[in-house]
From Swiss-Prot:
ATP binds at G241, P242, P243, G244, T245, G246, K247, T248. It is found in: Cell membrane. Residues 66-148 are extracellular. The keyword Signal does not apply. It is an enzyme of class 3 (hydrolase). One of its GO terms (biological process) is proteolysis. This is ATP-dependent zinc metalloprotease FtsH. The active site is at E464. Residues 647-756 are annotated as: Disordered. Residues 744-756 have a biased composition (Polar residues). Keywords: ATP-binding, Cell membrane, Hydrolase, Membrane, Metal-binding, Metalloprotease, Nucleotide-binding, Protease, Transmembrane, Transmembrane helix, Zinc.
Length: 756
């Protein structure tokens, strides 16, 4: 039976439910005020703010409770002389006189009341005393100065309070705005299996590193699989490699796959301005990690804290070294029973302390390099997922056109392609967008606002054409895939020379070819305009660096020999990266300079000779560049189909007196298999009759290079003579000097020559 509305329930439960519902309603003012007060109390600024408010209250109270108002000294003396004062009190030391008047003192419309005070200077003390004696006062008192407890407290606590607030503020800044005592705590972020972001399936192109880290995951998931064989879980894994190759991404994948708590921290988060903070944070990090059954600690950019000790000005008292010492102890110290695996990433493994790299700390050191062609294709497919890609886009070809690109570069290419498509209001990402994105990543955005006059465009066209033509005429250079005279980044134009496959080493002949086509732009300017420009400065720098490395690093100079000249990088302050120390004599340095000069001159002469022999093709290429501004691989191949190629380079020996041999290398099993397949497919041939060997041919001297005959104009004769008129006659140029070892920085993944 129900209870009528408005009547109390017999057992009294109904009002109780109403009160409980009211108390649990989050929208009630009472609940909101409680939450606000709780938030206010837990705020890091609550206690210093409260102290400031209390001190201000004391100051205001002391200010507003002043018993009397001040009047001028002459007014006070006049009141005494006029017998208007009832009682007086002199405060010795303050030179202050407090007066109690018989009636209110008024000055104009201002009523001062019956309590006033005035101050006097020492010379007028006698005058004040005489006025007191003649005033007929009811009471008169001399009182020494007594500082009030409140005033003493304020004067004592105010400096302490200000210093405390300043200290609180500084500690809050150091500790990221948290409480004062937390600045020595670890700054690591903890991730659990409930918050996975990246999986191993999201990582591509680094299969070896992925396999090693998957094994770490198996160590944590199934330790019995390894411990039954006596294997121990590795203490640490060091990931090293160039920037952008995916070291941090691999760590994120481990965090998503591990199934154990994952702590992430940067190496720079350990060291602060206060001594001992770094070591304290290391202890706190490992203490927290060891409290879990198993955990992974990831230290990004560990070179910030793990640099070699004993280097620099700090010595043993360096705060960074104390932090490193604590890290060494935590990873493999006296307490060897640890369930923590440390994963670290760096792109400077050469500067790390040897004690950090030894087995027992970082047992595994995994190199993460730029991906190969297959890896680049996999990375492109990962980053293409979720993007509308046109059916005409072949990611395998895109991977082929991007040698040397890291995972970050490829991700940037796909993102730039998407941005360019959105800028043009497109719906799908096509080849044009991807091609432009590759150019933007390699050379920067196109400078459409940089307008060159016709002469500069012509100089740029011949300059880039010189690079491309020399590269096409050499036997050991990669194919030319693109030429453009559109300004991009800091360059006025550029030529792409891309290998068909990934290369991991460079031969001497390839280095010579690199130097020759690097000098092709300068040679073309000299031949055509007889007035070279500053656009070849970058080319000369690259060729010089290549020549220097050939002589001093690669042992490719017959004069210097197979000697490594120049010491390792010195370590003055930063644990590496200093200037290279010269550990050879001045006489050897002079020989090195002479060899570098000879290599550069030979490369320049070779480029000059190639352009003279192919001047008609150079003019045709320059005209096409002026007309279209950008030429792609198929168009370039059509122009270069009649290029007069240079002969194969001679065999080179580091010492001329060594015995020469022409025995070829053995054939690889794959080559033998291909020959066997061809022999099975080819029809049986009739037996051949052996022929006696021919007599050795007589060496005939080669005539000097003759100028090319005049050719028909490419366009009408009224056009610019450097492009449209027939090829001009040029005097004979001597053949390149005796073959010398030359250098070029080994560009294993393609080359790009810029004019800018």
């Amino acid at each position: 039976m129900g209870v009528p509305a408005g009547m109390p329930h017999p057992n009294g439960l109904q009002p109780q439910r109403k009160d409980k519902a009211l108390a649990q309603n989050p929208n009630t003012p009472q609940k909101g005020s409680e939450a606000f007060l709780k938030k206010l109390i837990h705020s890091s600024w609550f206690f210093p703010g409260a102290a400031i408010v209390v001190m201000l209250g004391f100051l205001m109270a002391s200010f507003f409770t002043q018993p009397s108002r001040q009047v001028d000294t002459n007014v006070g003396l006049q009141l005494l002389n006029d017998h208007q004062v009832k009682s007086a009190k002199i405060y010795d030391g303050d030179q202050r006189v407090e007066l109690q008047l018989k009636d209110d003192y008024k000055k104009g419309n201002d009523n001062y009341g019956k309590s006033v005070r005035f101050y006097y200077v020492q010379p007028r003390g006698d005058e004040v005393a005489k006025a007191m004696e003649s005033a007929e006062l009811e009471s008169y008192t001399d009182q020494p100065v007594e500082h009030s407890f409140l005033g003493s407290l304020v004067s004592l606590l105010l400096p302490i309070l200000l210093f405390g607030v300043l200290f609180w503020f500084l500690m809050g800044r150091v500790g990221g705005g948290s409480s004062v005592m937390s600045f020595s705590k670890s700054r690591a972020k903890k991730f659990t299996k409930d918050k996975p972001e990246v999986r191993f399936s999201d990582v591509a192109g680094v299969d070896e590193a992925l396999a090693e880290l998957e094994e770490v995951r198996e160590f944590l998931a199934e330790p019995e699989k390894f411990t039954r064989l006596g294997a121990k879980i590795p203490k640490g894994v060091l990931l090293y490699g160039p920037p952008g190759t995916g070291k941090t991404l691999l760590a994120k994948a481990v965090a998503g796959e591990a199934g154990v708590p994952f702590y992430s921290i940067s190496g720079s988060d350990f060291v602060e301005m206060f001594v001992g903070v770094g070591a304290s944070r290391v202890r706190d990090l490992f203490k927290e990690a060891k409290s879990d059954p198993a955990a992974i600690v990831f230290v990004d950019e560990i070179d910030a804290v793990g640099r070699r000790r004993g280097v620099g000005m700090g010595g043993g008292n360096d705060e960074r070294e104390q932090t490193l010492n604590q890290l060494l102890v935590e990873m493999d110290g006296f307490d060897g029973n640890s369930n923590v695996i440390v994963i670290a990433a760096t792109n400077r493994p050469d500067v790390l302390d040897p004690a950090l790299l030894r087995p027992g700390r970082f047992d595994r050191q995994i190199g993460v390099d730029a991906p190969d062609m297959q890896g680049r294709e996999h990375i492109l497919r990962v980053h293409a997922a979720g993007k509308p890609i046109a059916n005409t886009v072949d990611l395998a070809q895109v991977a082929k056109r991007t040698p040397g690109f890291t995972g970050a570069d490829l991700a940037n290419v796909m993102n730039e392609a998407a941005l360019l498509t959105a800028r043009d209001n497109g719906n799908v990402i096509d080849d044009r967008a991807i091609d432009e994105a590759i150019d933007r990543v390699m050379a920067g955005p196109q400078r459409s606002s940089r307008i060159m006059n016709e002469h500069e465009r012509k100089v740029t066209a011949y300059h880039e054409g010189g690079h491309a033509l020399v590269a096409a005429a050499l036997r050991n250079s990669a194919p030319v895939t693109k030429i453009t005279i559109l300004p991009r980044g800091r360059a006025l134009g550029y030529t792409m020379v891309m290998p068909q496959d990934d290369k991991y080493s460079t031969t001497r002949h390839e280095l010579l070819d690199q130097m020759a086509y690097a000098m092709g732009g300068r040679a073309a300017e000299e031949i055509v305009f007889h007035d070279p420009s500053t656009g070849a400065s970058n080319d000369i720098q690259k060729a010089t660096d290549t020549a220097r490395k050939m002589v001093t690093d690669y042992g490719m100079s017959a004069v210097i020999g197979s000697v490594k000249l120049g010491g390792e990088d010195t370590e003055p302050f930063l644990g590496g990266g200093g200037a290279s120390a010269r550990n050879y004599s001045d006489a050897t340095a002079a020989k090195v300079d002479a060899e570098i000069r000879a290599l550069l001159e030979q490369a320049h002469d070779e480029a000059f000779q190639i352009l003279l022999e192919n001047r008609d093709i150079l003019d045709r290429l320059a005209f096409a560049l002026l007309e279209k501004e950008t030429l792609l691989e198929n168009e370039i191949a059509e122009i270069f189909k009649d290029v007069r190629k240079r002969p194969e380079r001679e065999h080179w020996y580091s010492k001329p007196t060594r015995e020469r041999t022409d025995i070829p290398p053995v054939k690889a099993p794959s080559e033998l298999a291909k020959e066997a397949e061809k022999s099975e497919e080819a029809p049986a041939e009739a037996p051949t009759v052996p022929v006696a060997p021919a007599a050795p041919a007589q060496q005939v001297p080669v005539a000097p290079t003759q100028p090319l005959p005049p050719q028909a104009p490419l366009t009408d004769p009224d056009a610019d003579p450097t492009v449209a008129m027939p090829t001009q006659q040029y005097p004979n140029y001597p053949a390149p000097p005796e073959h010398r070892p030359e250098n070029g920085t080994p560009n294993q993944n393609g080359a790009e020559n810029e004019r800018g």
